[in-house]
Amino acid sequence: QKAVRRMIAVPPSRRSGRRAIIFITSISAEVSSVNRPEYCLSKSGLSMTARLFADRLAASGLNVYEIRPGIIRTDMTAAVRERYDRLIAEGTIVPQARWGFPEDVGKAAAALALGRFAYSTGLVLEVSGGMNLRRL
């Protein structure tokens, strides 16, 4: 809250442009994973926090965004790498049929932070290779 109050109090410079708060959550904010309920609940809580911040801060000129990474190749996914390699190769869970990388998430965050979506707030950007698509 202290950081938000400061962001509101200090007007943006011409160079920095619009200010943004970016929450990094996970597709687990909406996708159930029965073996990781605590993780899913925490991400879903952050997702609602982002939505509430967006609603509350819009009039203050602060845009709030949420990035939901999908299956990203990191140390956190190392234990399930073989399983996900197989599922990704089959094309059943990731339509783009590849792992996501931290750089994919970083590029999304950079676009939001640079004000590329200045007339958007509360935007949820899934960086998931299409995992959000409903398919038969």
For each feature predicted by the language model, list its residue ranges.
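Short, small/polar-rich loop/turn modules that mediate ligand/substrate recognition or access, typified
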Residues: A58, N63, Y119-G122
